[in-house]
Amino acid sequence: MTAAVLWKRLLLAAVFCAAPARPETLPLVFAASPGNDLYRTLAATGACARYDSPAEAVAKAPAGSGVLLLADGYPERTTPIDGPLLDRAARKRLRLYLEYPAWLPGLELGAPRATRWERTVVSSGVFGPALERLRILAIHGCRFLPVAAPNADLVAARVAGFDTAVYGLPPKDVYPILFEHPNGRLLVATTKLSQFITARYAPAGAWGPVWKHILTWLCPGRKIPDLVWTPSVRPSYSPTEKLPLDYEIQAFRRGVRWFENARMLVHPAWKRSLDDARKYPDQVGPMPDPSWPSGDGSEGLLEGFSSTIRHDGSQLVRWWLRNDCMGESSASFAFSGVIEGNRDRSKAAANLNDFIYFHSVLASGSRADPRSASFGLAGWNTTPKYYQEMDGFGVYYGDDNARSMLGTMAAAALLQSPRWDEMLLRCLLANLRTTGRLGFRGNRLDEAPLQKNGWRHYFHSERINYAPHYEAYLWATFLWAYEHTGFRPFLDRTRNAIRMTMAAYPDEWHWTNGMQQERARMLLPLAWLVRLEDTAEHRAWLRRIATDLLALQDASGAIREEIGPAGKGDYGPPQTNEAYGTNEATLIQRNGDPLCDLLYTTNFAFLGLHEASAATRESLYAEAEDRLARFLGRIQVRSQSHPELDGAWFRAFEFKRWEYWASNADAGWGAWSIETGWTQAWLTSVYGMRQLKTSLWDLTKDSQVHRHLDNLVRLMFEGERFE
């Protein structure tokens, strides 16, 4: 089934039972609340009887009919059931579908337990070709009842794979989810399957065949039409729907509004919740209450949403204050301030940068001491002892510093403020003096070894690190810094590192989650190198990387992920079922999976293509950027029931099925995660630049950071001589 056909079917009004004009209806009786997803879908035609309790439903059901005893108390309470009730059903020859039961005849049910790594896997052939054996589904927020039941149709198990459990089912810890009871005429779900809309079970298109099987079992011999419904969280447009002429400004406005609707801006009234969140595993917990006020940036901004979806369809939030996310997001607010004339958002942009550089631990302490080796650097996050005895603000990722600075550059230009110029240049120089002779800084530095070794140890080293994910955006900021200061080490070291990296491409490159993200990251420094030195060689470097990246751009505009050579990556797909969910990971299992990644690749490709187009005026980049802009406008989240998600972009999108779906193997940032910085900030910012018909390079052309160069070089490079 094509994505276009599937999408049209999912957006039909909820219809299931035979049309009212037909004399025949399905003989179904419900014991469920009137708000149950399945009941509401079936009841659209008024063809299904409903009662409040299992006992009443069994008593009122016509002989030989199908009765659905649904789990209204889920997940706190199991569905009340007993022997006499089943005896009455048997005497009436009823066929029962029973969810989350309190008791089963002849089978011992364990206490309810929650899934952690387990996903739902098709374990039989009852669903036919629509859902073949070992197909993977997601029951979000699943709590189930362990039971020993043979021949289950669906099971919960920890498995690796994108769509299919590629290593099969594990030898143990496989839990029945849907099975026919040995006594017959009783189909049991050990969890609640009927909240498939509310809890956003995925892929949405897979749950139609599940229900068709269940209802066919309940009504043998009857023709069961396909189940269709509107997902509660869905893409804004289908793959073939005509986009509005103003779709870009709509996407921009909704994307910036999302920060406020999701309560990402911390407000003083609930600031204490940040401290309370440290008790959550990995500081991931329930989202801010929608009734709480949205902040103004002065208390910082949360990292974003975790990929964990709860049984009510809400998602957990990452309660971290991260330098990169805040700096990047400040640009989004600043663009809104200019484009929409929104003074509150301009203020938020300024406040976020003030928080980073003046009012938080991120740039204070050793980072504010000129005698310290970490002087000028910005810490990764504000959490003390975030990992064992290591403080989050004592961790220095170069790429995170770089992206935060890029956001500050944009915000300063849009706000026409020199307020952060000195701090910005100080951070640029701090990163430069921890970059080696050859132009490589390495993946990250930590406070303790940095203080022990001193900055000169790194400045005079000859490390090599062919990892654009970690290196490329610092190179871009260094090229920008050279343009505005003329300080030669910014250019010389960077140009050398880029030359070495291009000579090493692709065989010696080290990839993080995939090869496409490394290519996407290289676009920005290569485009800005053309700005500084427009040579045939530099244009050829840019074209080579872009051509290889765009070789995997789908007709829809999506950029497909690709895993790099074995042995050259950090976070590849899990190689065993047991490895699933234990580390950061790519969201595909093998090359060819139709997945685009909006956290690591697509977002940075959008920015890189935009800057490449502006630098070269070549159609290759402009046309690819336009295709990507249309695609991103289509897949932006739309949801009336979850305003905290409306206007966002999830990390993963499966562009053939046109759904939010992936392997979700990443331990921290899975398929449904939303990052305020990396993703939301850059997608809205590029849309903003397209509205203003400018580029990041041109937008920031009037920066006055050079005014602070001489004093800072004397302070930070004492004893060093430069040609």
Q: Across the structure, where does each feature detected by a protein language model lie?
A:
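Extracellular ligand-binding/catalytic regions of CAZymes and related secreted enzymes
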Residues: 25-27, 37, 69, 97, ...
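Helical hinge/lid and interdomain linker segments adjacent to catalytic or ligand-binding clefts
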Residues: 26-108
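An acidic, glycine-rich "communication" segment
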Residues: 95-170
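Extended, well-ordered alpha-helical scaffold segments
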Residues: 206, 244-262, 267, 272-280, ...
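Low-complexity, Ser/Thr/Pro/Gly-enriched N-terminal "stalk/linker" regions
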Residues: 223-325, 347-391, 425-426, 430-453, ...
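Well-ordered alpha-helical scaffold segments within catalytic/enzyme domains
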Residues: 234-243, 327-343, 403-419, 472-488, ...
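Solvent-exposed loop and edge beta-strand segments that line ligand/cofactor-binding
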Residues: 309-326, 338, 383-403, 454-471, ...
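CBM-like carbohydrate-recognition segments
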Residues: 562, 567, 572-577, 625-723
